[in-house]
Amino acid sequence: ITEDIVRSRYQASIQPGAQEAFSAMFPAPRQRWVHALASPEEAIRALPHETLVIHGREDRVIPLSNSLRLCALIPRAQLHVYGHCGHWTQIEHAGRFARLVRDFLTE
């Protein structure tokens, strides 16, 4: 993660109302909302579409094992793992990420 990304995220977090907005999206207890957003395995297995799963190998927010599990469940999934990348593949590898998504959507 670059200093620019750190600075950008910090600046966003100290904007007036930022903390309140986050808390409103995920009120305590936060894990309850994570579970509420989860889909049952049967629904995931039933996905009929080509599915692109993208993950940063060094992601400390969501373990890579989650994406590996998704790909095991989704019949038509493909996984792309970016090395030297944390949670924000779309920022940390913006150009490569955009090309990958564009190519996936235009196939």
Residue ranges and their predicted role:
Residues 1-45:
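Conserved alpha/beta-hydrolase catalytic His-Asp/Glu region
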Residues 56, 63-66, 92-93:
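Active-site helix-initiating loop/hinge in glycosyltransferases
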